[in-house]
Structure formats: C-alpha cells, structure tokens
C-alpha cells in the first residue's frame, strides 16, 4: 500500500533544495506543518488541533497512552487495521471486536449497541483496510452525533482519497472526534 513509483519530481526538487540543512535536528513538535494543516482545515494558525506522528499507528499509540486505562473498552469491527487492537491491549484496555456487516462495512448500529459504561473509545476505519468499503457519510454523521460525548470517536481516514467523505469538517462540532489521515497513502 505504499507508493511503488517513488517520489514525485516536485518532492525530489524540494529535498534537493534543503539538502544543505540535513545536519540540523528537525523541529520535534512539527510546529510549522501543524499550523499549515490546521489553517487548511479551518482552524486558527496555532497548530493546536493537529498532531504529527509516525503513521496512523503512532497516533493510535498516543491515543491509547492518553485515554485508555485498565479495563476501558474500545469498540471496533474486524477485519480492519491491526493497530487498533494493539493500542488497546498495550494499555490494558479491553477490545470489543464486532464483525463487519454482510457487505463488509463497519456495523454502526452494533457498535452503538455495544457501548457500555466502560466504553472509552470507538475506532472506525473509513474506507476500511483491508476491505476498501466506505461507511455512508450521513450514517457516520448520525452515529457521531448520538455517541455519548465522553467517548472518543476515532475515524481513521488513511485511505480517504480513494473513496468516502472526510469527517474533518465535523471536528469543529464534536470535541470527542479524532480524525486520522496520513501522508503515506494519499495527499
């Protein structure tokens, strides 16, 4: 699922332009790129609404470390991206794994019905990896709206450029919504 064609000519040109600075440590907080991504998505230029990590797995690990405590439940469907289970288990949480629907989509109704007082997080891969199926955007909006606000909803959009509508605009309405995107799959 990585780019088999190599970097674009523009990327090579940009790297060549900066090669004289490779001896300098990069900004560990990625301030400039966080600011630019934030502004691109309708936030102020503080960068406070953007986190940069090494792939979706890095973000999921951070979310697990910050939010998941022993006994907390995290709901997701399988088959899907394996890092959800890993982030839960590493932090002593309990994965609540549900099957996909017959048409291989995340079963939002079953996920909602699985919510308990121990539910801390819900993870939705949209489009799903490995099936490529997409959850209807209106159904996803309704789901996000009705989930209790103390539950973190993670929508993993690593493959969003291949189908579906991004949930990024919904971040402005729902403080419990985290949207993950990546540079390695698209953009």
Task: Tell where the protein language model's regions lie, with residue ranges.
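Conserved beta-strand segments of alpha/beta enzyme cores
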Residues: 44, 49, 94-96, 176-178
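Active-site pre-lysine segment of PLP-dependent enzymes
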Residues: 89, 97, 106-117, 130-153, ...
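PLP-dependent aminotransferase-like
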Residues: 66-124, 138
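N-terminal small-domain helix-loop-helix segment of the aminotransferase-like
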Residues: 1-57, 62
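Short glycine-rich anion-binding loops that position phosphate/pyrophosphate groups of nucleotides
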Residues: 1-4, 56-57, 81, 126-130, ...
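A general structural signal for well-ordered alpha-helical segments in protein cores
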Residues: 8-12, 30-34, 60, 84, ...
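Short, well-ordered alpha-helices that flank and scaffold nucleotide-derived cofactor binding pockets
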Residues: 13, 17, 39, 65, ...
